[in-house]
Amino acid sequence: MKMKRPHVVPLSKQVAALLQELYDWTGHGELIFPSPFSNTSPISDVGLLNALRRMRYGREEMCVHGFRAMASTLLNECGRYRHDVIEAQLAHQEKNAVRNAYNHAQYLPERKIMMQEWADWLDEMRASEN
């Protein structure tokens, strides 16, 4: 759910494997990332922000929303993906009221390809650092 609307997220092979590993470790609860205080509530933005700070990222370096901004910028700049596909992946609502009323496309096939290529690129970046 995002903004009280269902949001389907295509997963890369890498993310599916990580989620399976998390499932194996953390049990079989309803939430993948539960709050440390309650198994019925998801982890909060503050919890994610605290994790970034523990990794020594300063306020001016990274925030939780920064991951979405970084993905949007890089995916748009590379020129391989249509703007509508990127916006759908980020669950951004169309600002044009008429288009928003009529276009309910989810672009799932294109988003699946985009997310797999994004994950592959991240793997390449990590490998090049080593």
Question: Predicted segments — roles?
Answer:
Residues 9, 17-40, 46-88, 92:
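Short, basic (Lys/Arg/His-rich) helix/loop patches that form interaction surfaces
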Residues 23-29, 49, 110-113, 122, ...:
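Extended, non-catalytic subsegments within catalytic or DNA/protein-binding/adaptor domains
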Residues 12, 34, 103:
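Residue-level detector of conserved, well-ordered beta-strand and adjacent loop positions
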Residues 1-4, 16, 80, 90-125:
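Catalytic-site neighborhood detector that most strongly recognizes the C-terminal catalytic loop/helix
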